[in-house]
Curated annotation (Swiss-Prot):
Designated name of the protein: ATP synthase subunit delta
SUPFAM superfamilies: N-terminal domain of the delta subunit of the F1F0-ATP synthase
Family of this protein: Belongs to the ATPase delta chain family.
GO molecular function, one term: proton-transporting ATP synthase activity, rotational mechanism
Stored InterPro entries: ATP_synth_OSCP/delta_N_sf, ATPase_OSCP/dsu
Keyword ATP-binding: no
Keywords: ATP synthesis, Cell inner membrane, Cell membrane, CF(1), Hydrogen ion transport, Ion transport, Membrane, Transport
Function text: F(1)F(0) ATP synthase produces ATP from ADP in the presence of a proton or sodium gradient. F-type ATPases consist of two structural domains, F(1) containing the extramembraneous catalytic core and F(0) containing the membrane proton channel, linked together by a central stalk and a peripheral stalk. During catalysis, ATP synthesis in the catalytic domain of F(1) is coupled via a rotary mechanism of the central stalk subunits to proton translocation.
């Protein structure tokens, strides 16, 4: 596990605990996604390392306009600990904890071409049956897959792509 994830874990858990206590999962998701995107920009990352940038300025830079007091205090804690650069990891950990709490599996379905809603509904039903949880599907298109799809739930990857099948066939023929 990367050092960044290790360092971000307590902050992700803290953000989740605060959001759960207030019943504000969605606003915290939105705020963390905003802050993570801003902090992930290389120019902003360099600015955050500048000692001339004050803590209040950093919090103002990274906070979304609709941020509540709890979220601003949370960013202040990160700024005090010089951990604002970990916001992308904190956001990812928060989303994982939220999905667990809401009994939702987040899946990314990458296909060679755009999929119809019927196909996505079939995949969602199969994943719900397999995991026993509701499924939140995000789609992506990657023409290099040639055909089929790759389903990634974080812990489980199902490669039903033609590219993957050809790679497995090549590997078995080589041995």
């Amino acid at each position: 596990m990367s050092q960044a994830l290790t360092l971000a874990r307590p902050y992700g858990r803290a953000a989740f605990a605060i959001a759960r206590e207030g019943g504000n999962f969605a606003p915290w998701s939105d705020a963390l996604a905003f802050s993570a995107q801003v902090a992930g920009d290389p120019r902003v990352a360099a600015l955050l390392l500048n000692p001339a940038l004050g803590q209040e300025q950093a919090v103002t830079l990274l906070a979304p306009p609709q941020a509540g007091e709890d979220y601003l205090r949370f960013l202040g804690v990160l700024a005090d600990a010089q951990r604002l650069s970990l916001l992308p990891e904190v956001a990812g950990l928060y989303e994982h904890l939220r999905a667990e709490a809401e009994h939702v599996v987040k899946a990314t379905v990458t296909s060679a071409a755009a999929m119809s809603q019927t196909e996505l509904d079939t995949i969602a039903a199969a994943l719900k049956k397999r995991f026993g949880r509701d499924v939140d599907i995000t789609t992506a298109v990657d023409a290099s897959l040639i055909g089929g799809a790759v389903i990634d739930t974080g812990d489980v990857v199902i490669d039903g792509s033609l590219k993957g099948k050809l790679a497995r066939l090549q590997s078995s023929l080589a041995h």
